[in-house]
Regions:
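Structural alpha/beta surface segment adjacent to cysteine/selenocysteine redox centers
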Residues: 19, 23-118, 202-212
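N-proximal short alpha-helices
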Residues: 4, 42, 46, 158-161
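Non-catalytic pre-domain segments flanking phosphatase-related domains
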Residues: 1-8
Length: 213
């Protein structure tokens, strides 16, 4: 009976994202798998800032990884049956777009539209800002956010992501546990069925293995 009540009451989760990430696009298109279990709050961050804070780099910044990663994205879109188109260049700066999403306190409808503009339409918002704003349901003359409070909000979101254990996107945080990557939806679902998972000996050991280098 207790398990039934737990299943019937979604718990809170935070989803950190940046529209630069095709894997975040693939994730949000599958988030319905979690809808009955987690009330997910989309939270925009600046991925470049998170990378700097965690001494990390994205595959798009590593020449040897780019072809493999991008071709894998094409395959995954086909596998998932999702429309998908790369922008003419990638990566690109997403500061203005992420600030706008933070400023608007964007919920899922707007977040999905932002991702679709990049990964379905294949466009860089910086090159067609008025059109991007209209695509989100905003006025074409919406300015690129420059207010100190908006800048501070995006920075704060990014800092909170790091504090929550994120080092990349997409990352879903549940109960203080960070699940990174489009391939961790099943892991998150298993955790919800087995919330003591991270207290088990094997997980405790795996989380503390020292480096041999």
């Amino acid at each position: 009976m207790i398990q039934e009540l737990k299943s019937a009451t979604p718990i809170a989760g935070t989803f950190y994202y940046d529209i630069i990430s095709p894997f975040s696009y693939f994730y949000i298109k599958q988030r319905h798998r979690l809808d009955q279990r987690v009330n997910i709050q989309p939270t925009p961050i600046l991925l470049g800032g998170l990378f700097r804070a965690t001494d990390n780099r994205g595959p798009g910044e590593i020449e040897a990884k780019r072809p493999h990663t991008y071709q894998y994205c094409v395959w995954l879109a086909e596998k998932l049956g999702l429309p998908f188109q790369f922008p003419d260049h990638h990566p690109f700066l997403t500061v203005a777009a992420q600030r706008l999403l933070a400023q608007q306190d964007a919920q899922w409808e707007m977040v999905e539209r932002a991702f679709e503009y990049v990964w379905v339409e294949g466009k860089d918002p910086n090159l067609s800002w008025p059109e991007f704003c209209q695509y989100l349901g905003l006025a074409a003359d919406t300015p690129k956010p420059d207010a100190p409070e908006t800048k501070a909000k995006l920075i704060s979101n990014t800092e909170k992501a790091k504090a929550d254990g994120a080092f990349g996107v997409p990352t879903l945080v549940i109960d203080g546990h960070a699940f990174w990557g489009v391939d961790t939806i099943d892991w998150a679902l298993d955790y919800l069925d087995r919330p003591e998972m991270f207290e088990e000996v094997a997980y405790q050991h795996a989380g503390k293995i020292p480096s041999g280098l």
